[in-house]
Amino acid sequence: MKNEESGMKNFYLNKMFVLAVILFATCVPGFADNHRGRLQIGTGLLYERGMDLTVAYEHETRYHNAWEYFGNVYLKWDECASCGHVCPKSFWSNYNTWGLGVAYKPCVTRGRNHHCNLRIGGSLGSDRHNVVGSVHAGYEHSYSLRKGWQVYWQVKSDLMIGGNDLFRTGVVIGVKLPIK
């Protein structure tokens, strides 16, 4: 009699365990490919005597394709006419631009912990006096880390419309932080 009761208890415990596993598996969201957004911060050097800072929100879609909504600040320094080298005034006050834009990043190759995207987009902004538009093209390589973090590097080329520069090209490195 005791054997039958313990057998029934084990049967119900096994049933409860299986039910709990099924509920857990269906109710808890997965994190492998969740298409959540990332905050992206990157900085780099551009030819000729330029520095770039980009802060962006990246929304990843299927197969590592992504949309990027970004704000960009560019600083171009020059040598000081009076002292002959780069001083704080010639560094910070020479030529500055800012812009807001959108870029589409189709994935061209994927690996185990990395993926590569083309970066195609446009932006609109201003320097100190005029409206400045730009067309962006480039290549981005991202490496996945733990907890959804990524590090990346970009080779970027910008065609400037209405600014002092016509072309800007350079390398940017940065980090992508997951937004939950």
Indicate residue ranges for each PLM-predicted region.
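Solvent-exposed loop/turn segments connecting transmembrane beta-strands
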Residues: I41-T54, W92-N96, S123-V135, L159-R168
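Short glycine/proline- and aromatic-enriched beta-strand/turn motifs that initiate or cap beta-hairpins
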Residues: G30-W77, G170, K176-K180
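Internal, hydrophobic beta-strand segments that form the core of beta-sheet-rich folds
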Residues: Q154-V155
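Gram-negative (and chloroplast) outer-membrane scaffold detector with strong preference
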Residues: E58-V151, L177-K180
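Cleavable N-terminal export/targeting peptides
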Residues: M1-R36, I179-K180
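Short amphipathic alpha-helical "recognition" segments used for binding
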Residues: S6-K9, L13, L19-A20, A56, ...
